[in-house]
């Protein structure tokens, strides 16, 4: 009875706090009380994982991230003693809006959000100046429920633009007026309800595809705008296997774009990089390509040797080139000199090398 009353309090509080977000912020009853055997051994359970996005005509989005987490044991208590959220300061701003702890003994604690901290995020392989907002919760006990909301403004993909500043234009995506997102629908903890809702201007269209799984989707008209909602329930952690592909290629995910065709994003990306000179020739690279393809008779032999050389010699390491990082490739001279880059730069290096071969260039 004690736990039922605590969860009832959570529902009442979230219904009030999330009233304007509608479907994206509703949650189901606590199944850890109804089916405890299903969640035995898990450190924590996400009762709700919800994101609601309001898209502006420029393509910039205002994100409301709502999460309700139940602590199941002492390991879960330790893991959740500090809340963390990653963001890119060059394209977004994020802050905790509200954090409430519903204690197993019936106490309700509203944390002082002015105590939140903003630190440089730990980095490995990619060093683009990512940040983390953090909120210290302190001691938790099994049965406690954490209920918090994060507000974020900006965009998610196409990554970095110009320098940091107070200019609101930094929140507008490089492909101005277009919204694009990839939303993982897999989890690392059991999740009772996961929701992604995006609200766009009436004049915009949105195409979407759900891969490697199923969800419930709907489109409604709300206050002169279109609202797309995607819901998945009773999600269990995705099991990994040795040497399996990345979860983006194996687990449930949602992809969406406001462009008329999927190809429009790629065509825009290609033009940006051709205009920038990402594939411009340099003598030392031409010399290396001539050396590698010497004696190779067929087009596929040339493609194979160049692909292997790029894979072996351009290491994965993301060093920011400043303005344009994230949606503009590092040019060939930079990649060939530094012998490193992220996935887009490695692919760009291979494309540039293929352009040096007359017969392979047509299939670059």
Language-model regions, residue ranges each:
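Conserved structured core elements
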Residues: 61, 140, 190, 279, ...
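Second-shell loop/turn segments in exported
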Residues: 132-136, 289-296, 332-340
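Lumenal/extracellular ectodomains and adaptor appendage modules
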Residues: 20-190, 261
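Long, intrinsically disordered, low-complexity accessory segments associated with secretion
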Residues: 307-312, 316-336, 346-352, 358
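Bacterial Sec-dependent N-terminal signal peptides
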Residues: 1-23
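Secretory-pathway-linked proteins and extracytosolic
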Residues: 22-26, 153-157, 163-165, 178, ...
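Single conserved hydrophobic/aromatic residue that forms the stacking wall/gate
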Residues: 356-364
